Amino acid sequence: MALSGSTPAPCWEEDECLDYYGMLSLHRMFEVVGGQLTECELELLAFLLDEAPGAAGGLARARSGLELLLELERRGQCDESNLRLLGQLLRVLARHDLLPHLARKRRRPVSPERYSYGTSSSSKRTEGSCRRRRQSSSSANSQQGQWETGSPPTKRQRRSRGRPSGGARRRRRGAPAAPQQQSEPARPSSEGKVTCDIRLRVRAEYCEHGPALEQGVASRRPQALARQLDVFGQATAVLRSRDLGSVVCDIKFSELSYLDAFWGDYLSGALLQALRGVFLTEALREAVGREAVRLLVSVDEADYEAGRRRLLLMEEEGGRRPTEAS
């Protein structure tokens, strides 16, 4: 018998469910993507979509990227199960940095956790381990000599003052690689050093494409579909001709302090300011003329998190080794 005053079973709201699984709603994704589109990119998207066959028009009146994406949803061209058109439009704009947002996975905010590093802890560990290895190798050599001859250390020292015996000369001549193998661990090897790769993307582009598209895109074909294809091809050719190029490089880090400093400079904008003088040269400014040019710098957050975990694990393992050895 059910009680009349019993509380109903709790039901999850859509936002709570999405937050639990670390997902973004469709409209929240529209806010993230639309908020990063420039006015020039909005004009280009509205121009391309309004010229499509059967388009209702009116996208040019959109005042923001959010309004434009909401209008696409209202027309049935973009929904939760079909984001193909939005992905194609972002590729036309060369905004590949916005494509990961279409997966609707919420990105966790990352802040650099700085440590008060004096001398590098890994270098200290390397010196300490090398010192311990030299001591252990020297003691192992003396013990091995005692075991081979079966003599006490005092007798072994007296014999080494004079000329070595024939048996010792034969052993030394027959096994020349044994001391080299024992001394190899004493040298710090750089091949086994743990590193992580951080991918850096730098791109220079024009701030506005509208005037160039207005001058270079026109079609006189009577059919709507043919005119749309002609306009789209011309706009793509104009944008490709105005591509100023990009650079993608992988930076290796072996110290956690350097990685945190690099990420902190990226978040604060110091990295962008430092790269501006390297890429926006006088030759580039003379080539573009009076048009405004901007520099875009992107560092993958997933690379930073994975690299930080890797280096932090190396620091923890290196800290446990001296305690286990002692």
From Swiss-Prot:
It comes from the Eukaryota. InterPro entries: DEATH-like_dom_sf (IPR011029), DED_dom (IPR001875), DEDD/DEDD2 (IPR038856), TRADD-like_N (IPR049341). A motif (Bipartite nuclear localization signal) lies at residues 155-173. One of its GO terms (molecular function) is signaling receptor complex adaptor activity. Gene3D superfamilies: Death Domain, Fas (1.10.533.10). Residues 155-174 have a biased composition (Basic residues). Residues 104-194 are annotated as: Disordered. A motif (Nuclear localization signal) lies at residues 104-109. One of its GO terms (biological process) is rRNA catabolic process. Residues 25-104 form the DED domain. Its main location: nucleus. GO terms for cellular component: nucleolus; nucleoplasm. Keywords: Apoptosis, DNA-binding, Nucleus, Transcription, Transcription regulation. Expressed in most tissues. High levels were found in liver, kidney, heart, ovary, spleen, testes, skeletal muscle and peripheral blood leukocytes. Expression was absent or low in colon and small intestine. Residues 136-146, 175-191 have a biased composition (Low complexity). May play a critical role in death receptor-induced apoptosis and may target CASP8 and CASP10 to the nucleus. May regulate degradation of intermediate filaments during apoptosis. May play a role in the general transcription machinery in the nucleus and might be an important regulator of the activity of GTF3C3. PANTHER family: DEATH EFFECTOR DOMAIN-CONTAINING PROTEIN, DNA-BINDING DEATH EFFECTOR DOMAIN-CONTAINING PROTEIN 2. Interacts with CASP8, CASP10 and GTF3C3. Homodimerizes and heterodimerizes with DEDD. This is DNA-binding death effector domain-containing protein 2. It comes from Homo sapiens (Human). The lineage of its organism: Eukaryota, Metazoa, Chordata, Craniata, Vertebrata. The gene is DEDD2.
